UniProtKB/Swiss-Prot annotation:
The keyword Nucleotide-binding belongs to this UniProt entry's keyword annotation: no
GO biological process: 3,4-dihydroxybenzoate biosynthetic process; amino acid biosynthetic process; aromatic amino acid family biosynthetic process; chorismate biosynthetic process
Region forming the signal peptide: none
Known pathway: Metabolic intermediate biosynthesis; chorismate biosynthesis; chorismate from D-erythrose 4-phosphate and phosphoenolpyruvate: step 3/7
Source species of the chain: Methanococcoides burtonii (strain DSM 6242 / NBRC 107633 / OCM 468 / ACE-M)
Single GO MF annotation: 3-dehydroquinate dehydratase activity
Binding site residues for 3-dehydroquinate: 39-41, 73, 196, 219
Protein name: 3-dehydroquinate dehydratase
Residues forming coiled coils: none
Record carries keyword Amino-acid biosynthesis: yes
Key words of the record: Amino-acid biosynthesis, Aromatic amino acid biosynthesis, Lyase, Schiff base
Family: Belongs to the type-I 3-dehydroquinase family.
Gene3D superfamilies assigned to the protein according to its UniProt record, in alphabetical order: Aldolase class I
Catalytic residues as annotated in Swiss-Prot or TrEMBL: 132, 159
Length: 233
């Protein structure tokens, strides 16, 4: 069974709201607008210590029942973390017991990535291993290889976000989504914007949305994504 917290991803895909500023207000708004899960973007919130991160998660747990994904994104993968890699990883390890899932990049140093995967397994937390390409969409075999590599590295969910150069790139990603289990796939930007609505129909377990400003190219707002997905049911 694949879950994040109490949310059963085998019953239906989840709308994940990316929390990037004013966390208490954004979490409240996300819940009101139909989000299923919250992604707490420590790197965008300017949180740099384990104590700050833990305090925030405790506050959020006191105000919402939605499950949380802890993310502390590398700059090279679209994030804003400015500290050392050791501190980035240590923060995620230290707050693991307070979250429901953790997102770690496939491109992270293997030993550091393995530390997060090991800790998540010990704490019975869901592990998302993610990869982002903001320039292009690789060929289908490479897309599958990246997802397989993430699963081999210990991912419960392999997340892949790529930038299409044409509609064939978008179709290729959707076809791979249909073929590989337990994935989250996103075709970014204007060309791929619709995949945030339809990729779940092909097997994507998660689809990400914003509460205010988009944190990734082509990201829709929670309420708009919720309405669109309900139309597809």
């Amino acid at each position: 069974m694949l879950k994040i917290g109490t949310f059963d991803l085998e019953e239906r895909p989840a709308i994940v709201a990316a929390i990037s500023n004013e966390p208490l207000q954004q979490c409240k708004t996300a819940a009101e607008h139909g989000a299923d899960i919250l992604e707490i973007r420590f790197d965008l919130l300017g949180i740099t210590t384990s104590k700050e991160a833990a305090n925030l998660l405790r506050m959020l747990k006191g105000t919402t029942s939605l499950p949380c994904i802890a993310t502390n994104r590398l700059q090279s993968q679209g994030g804003n973390w400015e500290g050392t890699e050791e501190n980035r990883i240590a923060l995620l390890e230290d707050i693991m017991h307070l979250t429901d899932a953790v997102d770690i990049e496939l491109e992270t140093d293997e030993q550091l990535r393995d530390r997060i995967v090991k800790k998540a397994k010990e704490e019975s937390k869901t592990t998302i291993i993610s990869s982002h390409d903001f320039e292009r969409t690789p060929d289908k075999e490479t897309l599958k290889s990246i997802l397989d590599h993430s699963h081999d590295a210990g991912a419960d969910i392999a997340k892949l976000a790529v930038m299409p150069e044409n509609m064939q790139d978008v179709l290729n990603l959707l076809e791979v989504t249909l073929e590989v289990d337990d994935v989250c796939t996103i075709s970014m930007g204007k060309l791929g914007k619709h995949t945030r609505i339809i990729a779940p129909l092909y097997g994507s377990k998660l689809t990400y949305a914003s509460v205010s400003d988009a944190v990734a190219p082509g990201q829709l707002k929670v309420e708009d994504l919720k309405k669109a997905m309900e139309m597809m049911e």
